[in-house]
Swiss-Prot record:
Species name: Bos taurus
InterPro entries named among the record's database cross-references: 3-5_Exoribonuclease, ERI-1_3'hExo-like, Exonuclease_RNaseT/DNA_pol3, RNaseH-like_sf, RNaseH_sf
CDD domains: ERI-1_3'hExo_like
UniProt-recorded name of the protein: ERI1 exoribonuclease 3
Keyword ATP-binding: no
Cofactor annotation: Mg(2+)
Active site (record annotation): 152, 307
Amino acid sequence: MATASPAADGGRGRPWEGGLVSWPPAPPLTIPWTWMGPSWGQHPGHWGFPALTEPSASPAASLGIFEVRRVLDASGCSMLAPLQTGAARFSSYLLSRARKVLGSHLFSPCGVPEFCSISTRKLAAHSFGASMAAMMSFPPQRYHYFLVLDFEATCDKPQIHPQEIIEFPILKLNGRTMEIESTFHMYVQPVVHPQLTPFCTELTGIIQAMVDGQPSLQQVLERVDEWMAKEGLLDPNVKSIFVTCGDWDLKVMLPGQCQYLGLPVADYFKQWINLKKAYSFAMGCWPKNGLLDMNKGLSLQHIGRPHSGIDDCKNIANIMKTLAYRGFIFKQTSKPF
């Protein structure tokens, strides 16, 4: 897949133009639905963030410590990242975008939100809630879609060879909203070791009846291709990339089994993001225990059953969404084949 190219406006382009915006991660906080109340944050709209407690005596004091740092437009491909910056100022580019969305009366000449007359505030408030909902998104990513994948395979102690994929889940994650838009999920019948071991069933939760009579890997790969086409992911103008928890799935497991069976590996499986590497870039530490460490480091609850392929995909998607909220831009980590 093609890599993103900088947009003409200095990298602040929309994702479908190949641009991206990057800024330091901001701590999660509540942004008010309106600035009509006597204090900052009186009418909070949460969007999943913990509430922010600020002194209510002086609105001006509150305004002095926060800068609405990144406001692009109402396309939904932007986010507000309030930062504790002291003397906050907008660039002329960001200010012009902010005024288009919020209305110029909400801003002083220097770009800092100010409390205007009651009539002006009421006028601006009519469309403010909808504008905030559109703006309160994520930093533009390099890809339109992330395809979250996590295989489960036959296994035993000691390890059996060759291993065979028995669960094949993919979540289509929108790169703008970081929401799951579509799911591909199939079980695969192993052919070399058709009988699952007790160790495998205990680890993955997959019982024999779940794989008996299921399609072969070749048939599943054909259905993956059909699903990719149906979802518009094969369009050359759509940028997408797989995301895995580690390199094993697409560097070892899939190419190894395809080689054993004499099957080709589609090009879209040859580029991916290793979530462990992305997390280490964002958080500054390596998640030794994979998803468990990443969920713990981000104060997230683990979803579902460990080593369930589809549940692991949901955890990966949740971790990605949380990192994106903090301003992280995901980049390909795999090297070209």
